[in-house]
From Swiss-Prot:
Gene it is expressed from: MSRB8
Organism lineage: Eukaryota, Viridiplantae, Streptophyta, Embryophyta, Tracheophyta
Known EC number: 1.8.4.12
UniProt keyword terms in alphabetical order: Cytoplasm, Disulfide bond, Electron transport, Metal-binding, Oxidoreductase, Redox-active center, Transport, Zinc
Protein name as annotated: Peptide methionine sulfoxide reductase B8
Alphabetized Gene3D superfamilies for the sequence: Peptide methionine sulfoxide reductase
Note on how the cofactor is bound: Binds 1 zinc ion per subunit.
Record-linked Pfam families: SelR (PF01641)
Active site: 128
Segments traversing the membrane: none
GO-annotated cellular components: cytosol
Stated family: Belongs to the MsrB Met sulfoxide reductase family.
Classification via NCBIfam families: peptide-methionine (R)-S-oxide reductase MsrB
One GO MF term: metal ion binding
The protein's required cofactors: Zn(2+)
């Protein structure tokens, strides 16, 4: 069930035990979303996808990013310059170079935010997101 930006549930409202997650996620999705793993660089399904639509959490369906905020950073993972308001949580990592990003609803690991890298985007941020953490709904599919 995909959720729209207006239907972002409150934080932490979608908690499951590991065995419940394993029953609904692929082994790779579980490794990345629940164990904070990382996709292989350049191999993700959404790295080079620029179709109009919405990217949602593969764990709980919460809408996370609009395609209008996606850009080609050349990093090998899907890159966005901003998230749908309230959809993600950012947690500083040791050293302060990057922030871990997780789904605000199910706490699934999405990737990291890097700031100040000089991209010509409105926020000068790169949300580097694992493809396996995402599901995509084309804007055409809602017509």
């Amino acid at each position: 069930m995909a959720m729209t930006a207006a239907a972002v549930p409150s934080s932490g409202s979608f908690q499951k035990q590991d065995e419940e997650w394993r029953a609904v996620l692929s082994p790779e999705q579980f490794r990345v979303l629940r164990l904070k793993g990382t996709d292989k660089r350049g191999k993700g399904e959404f790295t080079k996808k620029f179709e109009e639509g919405t990217y949602s959490c593969a764990g709980c369906g919460t809408a996370l990013y609009k395609s209008t905020t996606k850009f080609d950073s050349g990093c090998g993972w899907p890159a966005f310059f901003d998230a749908i308001p309230g959809a993600i949580k950012q947690t500083p990592e040791a050293g302060g170079r990057r922030m871990e990003i997780t789904c605000a609803v199910c706490d699934g690991h999405l990737g990291h935010v890097f700031k100040g890298e000089g991209y010509s985007t409105p926020t000068d941020q790169r949300h580097c997101v694992n493809s396996v953490s995402l599901k995509f709904a084309s804007a055409d599919s809602s017509k």
